[in-house]
């Protein structure tokens, strides 16, 4: 009925009101990504029903059985068709405040239902089968995101930035909590660790990208296509491909090793402790190692040459979080992961650590307008990390924490001025190459304007 109501809305927009034509918000790109994610959900369930795929949840895990699967599948295909139509027709739609309000109200009711479902399901507060659906709930948040984006698209030119003011304060804690809660619920429901890890991170990242597009910290930090292509290559090749070849970093490999006898020789880890306590302890200890490795990257010139690849961008946004030289990434892994593998840390603990690590990392580098208040004394969030990327060397030599800021506070390197914001980010070298391969070799060919030991 919602879509029929929206379809009946009588609106005639002038060419200047066409959705997305002059907007800096990439509506179609955002909606397309969400559509692909939902299409993945629809296609994977019948595949695992026919073939056993170890990295994916079993057939029954994909739905709560509140509806017979044939009926559910037909509804999913209908929804997917509407989503595809929305992506294709978006540039030709006009603005309509009525359609926007209908979608917004529907979206918020949908949010309330799914949050209720998540809380009740995670803590076993009901025996009803509807509250067994961890995996479907994750994909319901994909649909919620689609509805909310479409709502804003229909009100383009009418919405005020102040409408998103609460996202400054709630965006970070809500998305971090949501990602972690979905992860714990999925593994509790029997989903494979790798699948639960990646899906939780993807859901959190979708939310971060939406936040930074609808309530950005700085318009000049919005990426262009020429920025996203090399960033995507860094994420795929450096963060996934190369670590896989080296048996480093990616959750799938770490989880495999964490469950093997090879890494349990030292097995001093307190496995009997509650899972959340183990994750918190791993975060605290790993941050100590990462703090000193990261600080060395800035204070020891040969290491800075490698790390400069990460700092070279003059913008901060979600997708350039993965911009690391392969050697830089390998060195960092040696400090924050290998010790825990050798100590025999359980695979669930390591997987949970990486969910927080990844979602916090995406948020940390995002262009989202964020105000964390007292949390800035605990986590290394966007407000703190932007100072770390400052072109002014005295400001950049601060806030080394990767996930937590506790060790910066202890060692006196925490920086968060109250009266101003960071001016420019980057390394000051305007000639630094932008292509993927050219950045890989840049440590050998390019100087940085501010050497860390000067």
Language-model segments: what does each one mean?
Residues 1-19, 438-454:
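Short, intrinsically disordered terminal tails adjacent to the first/last structured region
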Residues 19-30, 161-174:
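N-terminal membrane topogenic signal
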Residues 21-35, 100-104, 226-239:
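Alpha-helical transmembrane segments and their helix-start/interface "positive-inside/aromatic belt" motifs
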Residues 27-55, 62-92, 102-120, 135-156:
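Hydrophobic cores of alpha-helical transmembrane segments in multi-pass integral membrane proteins
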Residues 38-49, 180-185, 207-213:
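Alpha-helical transmembrane segments of multi-pass membrane proteins
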Residues 75-84, 174-178, 246, 327-339:
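Core segments of transmembrane alpha-helices
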Residues 182-196:
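Short, hydrophobic transmembrane alpha-helix segments
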Residues 230-424:
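Membrane-embedded catalytic scaffold of the fatty acid hydroxylase/desaturase
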């Amino acid at each position: 009925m919602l879509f029929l109501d929206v379809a009946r809305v009588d609106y005639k927009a002038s060419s200047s009101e066409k959705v997305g034509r002059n907007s800096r918000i990439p509506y179609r790109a955002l909606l397309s990504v969400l559509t692909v994610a939902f299409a993945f959900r629809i296609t994977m369930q019948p595949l695992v029903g026919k073939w056993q795929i170890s990295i994916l949840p079993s057939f029954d895990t994909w739905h709560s059985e509140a509806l017979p699967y044939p009926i559910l599948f037909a509804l999913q295909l209908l929804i997917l068709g509407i989503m595809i139509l929305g992506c294709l027709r978006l540039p030709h739609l006009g603005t309509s405040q009525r359609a926007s309000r209908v979608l917004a109200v529907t979206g918020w009711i949908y949010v309330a239902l799914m949050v209720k479902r998540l809380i009740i399901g995670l803590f076993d507060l009901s025996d009803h089968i509807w509250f067994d659906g961890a995996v479907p709930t994750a994909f319901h948040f994909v649909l919620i995101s689609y509805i909310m984006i479409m709502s804003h698209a229909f009100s383009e030119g009418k919405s005020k930035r102040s409408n998103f003011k609460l996202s400054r304060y709630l965006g970070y804690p809500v998305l971090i909590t949501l990602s972690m809660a979905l992860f714990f619920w999925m593994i509790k429901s029997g989903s494979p660790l790798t699948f639960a890890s990646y899906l939780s991170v993807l859901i959190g990242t979708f939310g971060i990208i939406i936040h930074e597009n609808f309530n950005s910290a700085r318009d000049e930090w919005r990426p262009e296509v020429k920025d996203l292509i090399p960033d995507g290559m860094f994420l795929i090749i450096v963060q996934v491909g190369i670590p896989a070849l080296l048996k480093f970093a990616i959750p799938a490999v770490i989880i495999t090793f964490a469950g093997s006898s090879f890494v349990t020789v030292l097995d001093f880890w307190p496995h009997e402790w509650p899972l959340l306590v183990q994750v918190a302890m791993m975060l605290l200890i790993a941050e100590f190692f990462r703090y000193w490795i990261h600080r060395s990257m800035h204070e020891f010139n040969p290491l800075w040459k490698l790390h400069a690849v990460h700092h070279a961008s003059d913008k901060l946004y979600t997708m350039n979080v993965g911009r690391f030289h392969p050697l830089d990434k390998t060195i960092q892994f040696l400090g924050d992961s290998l010790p825990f593998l050798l100590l025999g840390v359980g695979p669930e603990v390591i997987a949970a650590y990486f969910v927080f690590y990844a979602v916090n990392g995406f948020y940390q580098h995002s262009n989202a307008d964020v105000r964390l208040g007292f949390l800035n004394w605990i986590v290394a969030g966007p407000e703190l990390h932007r100072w770390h990327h400052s072109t002014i060397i005295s400001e950049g030599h601060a806030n080394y924490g990767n996930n937590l800021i506790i060790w910066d506070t202890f060692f006196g390197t925490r920086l968060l001025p109250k009266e101003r914001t960071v001016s420019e980010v980057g390394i000051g070298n305007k000639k630094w190459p932008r292509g993927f391969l050219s950045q890989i070799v840049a440590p050998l060919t390019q100087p940085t304007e501010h050497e860390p030991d000067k």
